[in-house]
């Protein structure tokens, strides 16, 4: 597939504030393709196949309990690979279909892929990347507040991702999220100005 000229992969570790940045970018008029929302929908559509793989222990009131499934896959790379083998190809296909439509607008847009740097070989057509950065200590604090996970569960989730520091030299744009929402909004505004200049729009 040829390069997606206007695509910018939006990525960052768990607890870096990636979803907040995606929301702010939408407020400023940018399109954001959300890999997680595609994944959540496909998880429901492929419930039978997922239960066949992992058993009925991941169900709660007849539906997949994402916390139970997360505990299984984040604690075991083999289990995670099995889930990814089922879900990743259709997620990727849908992302690329949406991206092709947005290319026609000749305006930069974002593809929110949490594990973009880990899965970079699957997206060679995406040449620009935006990393949302926060130090690991801050990631842990935010995850504790938001997800009520144990320290063991937090470490398992962080361990399933490339260390945030390793991603820094791979990114074209880096947005630091170490302050409050007002600080982040100002960072996003500065970023938008840079992107508009770079894309001549």
Swiss-Prot record:
It catalyses: 3'-dephospho-CoA + ATP = ADP + CoA + H(+). One of its GO terms (biological process) is coenzyme A biosynthetic process. Keywords: ATP-binding, Coenzyme A biosynthesis, Cytoplasm, Kinase, Nucleotide-binding, Transferase. It is found in: Cytoplasm. Pfam families: CoaE. GO terms for molecular function: ATP binding; dephospho-CoA kinase activity. Catalyzes the phosphorylation of the 3'-hydroxyl group of dephosphocoenzyme A to form coenzyme A. This is Dephospho-CoA kinase.
């Amino acid at each position: 597939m040829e390069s997606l000229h206007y695509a910018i992969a939006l990525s960052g570790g768990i607890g870096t504030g990636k979803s907040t940045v995606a929301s702010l970018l939408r407020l400023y008029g940018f399109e954001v393709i959300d890999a997680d929302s595609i994944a959540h929908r496909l998880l429901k559509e492929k419930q039978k196949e997922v239960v066949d793989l992992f058993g009925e222990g991941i169900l709660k009131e007849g539906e997949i309990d994402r916390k139970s499934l997360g505990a299984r896959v984040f604690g075991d790379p083999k289990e995670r690979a099995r889930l990814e083998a089922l879900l990743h190809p259709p997620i990727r296909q849908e992302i690329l279909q949406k991206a092709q439509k947005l290319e026609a607008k000749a305006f930069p847009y974002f593809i929110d892929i949490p594990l973009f740097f880990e899965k970079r070989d699957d997206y060679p057509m995406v040449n620009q990347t935006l990393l949302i950065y926060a130090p690991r200590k801050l990631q842990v604090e935010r995850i504790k507040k938001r997800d009520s996970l144990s320290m063991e569960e937090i470490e398992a989730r962080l361990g399933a991702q490339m260390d945030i520091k390793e991603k820094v030299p791979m990114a074209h744009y880096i947005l630091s999220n170490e302050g409050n929402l007002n600080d982040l909004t100002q960072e996003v505004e500065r970023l938008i100005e840079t992107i508009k200049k770079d894309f001549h729009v």
